C-alpha cells in the first residue's frame, strides 16, 4: 500500500493507472487486483494506511513533557513538510474529491478522536484543560499541513505566533507555577 501511495504522490492521482502502479510496486496488475477490488479501493485503502503512518510519525515526535513543547512547535512544521509534503498534497487531492469525500470525513473523525486523547494526556502535565488544548493542537496541525502544502511562511509564522501566545496565556491562567518554573 505504501508503495502505491508513494507512486500516486509522485506522479499524481489522475496520471497514474493500474499498470504504472503495478510497475512501481514490482508486481503485476492482476496481483494488485488480488488485494484490492478496484483502483478506487486501492486509493482509499492506501490513503488511509499512509496517512495513519504520517500521523504516527508526527505523534512519535510530539512532546511528552512541557519542557519540549516550544521546541516541538518551532521544528515540527518544517520537519513534516520535508518528510510528508507530497503525501499531504495527495491526501487532500483524494479526500476532497467527491468520490472519496466520505472516506476523508471518516478518517478525520478518527484524527479528531486521537488528538483529543493526546490533549487529555497533556492536561495533567500542562495543567490546562484538554478542552482548551485540543483546539490548539488542531491549529498547529492545520498550520503544519498548510505549510507542507503551500510552503506559506507568512501563514505558518502567524499561526505559530498566535498558538504560542495563547499557550502562554492559558499557562498563566491555569498553571502559573509552570510559567515560573520555565523562566
Predicted features along the sequence, with ranges:
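Amphipathic alpha-helical packing segments from all-alpha helical-bundle domains
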Residues: 55, 99-127, 131-135, 161
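Hydrophobic alpha-helical segments that form the core
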Residues: 128-150, 158-169
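Short, basic, alpha-helical segments at the C-terminal edge of helix-turn-helix-like DNA-binding modules
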Residues: 18, 47-55
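Short secondary-structure transition hinges
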Residues: 75-117, 150
Amino acid at each position: 500500500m505504501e508503495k502505491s501511495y508513494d507512486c500516486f504522490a509522485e506522479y499524481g492521482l489522475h496520471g497514474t493507472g493500474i499498470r504504472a502502479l503495478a510497475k512501481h510496486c514490482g508486481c503485476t496488475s492482476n496481483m494488485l487486483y488480488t488485494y484490492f477490488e478496484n483502483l478506487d479501493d486501492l486509493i482509499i485503502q492506501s490513503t488511509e494506511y499512509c496517512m495513519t503512518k504520517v500521523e504516527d510519525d508526527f505523534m512519535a515526535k510530539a512532546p511528552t513533557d512541557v519542557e519540549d513543547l516550544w521546541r516541538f512547535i518551532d521544528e515540527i512544521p518544517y520537519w513534516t513538510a520535508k518528510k510528508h509534503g507530497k503525501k499531504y498534497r495527495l491526501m487532500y487531492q483524494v479526500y476532497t474529491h467527491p468520490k472519496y469525500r466520505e472516506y476523508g470525513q471518516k478518517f478525520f473523525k478518527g484524527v479528531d478522536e486521537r488528538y483529543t486523547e493526546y490533549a487529555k494526556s497533556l492536561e495533567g502535565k500542562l495543567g490546562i484543560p484538554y478542552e482548551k488544548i485540543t483546539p490548539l493542537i488542531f491549529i498547529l496541525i492545520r498550520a503544519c499541513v498548510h505549510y507542507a502544502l503551500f510552503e506559506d511562511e507568512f501563514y505558518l509564522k502567524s499561526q505559530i505566533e498566535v498558538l504560542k501566545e495563547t499557550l502562554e496565556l492559558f499557562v498563566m491562567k491555569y498553571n502559573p507555577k509552570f510559567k515560573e518554573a520555565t523562566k
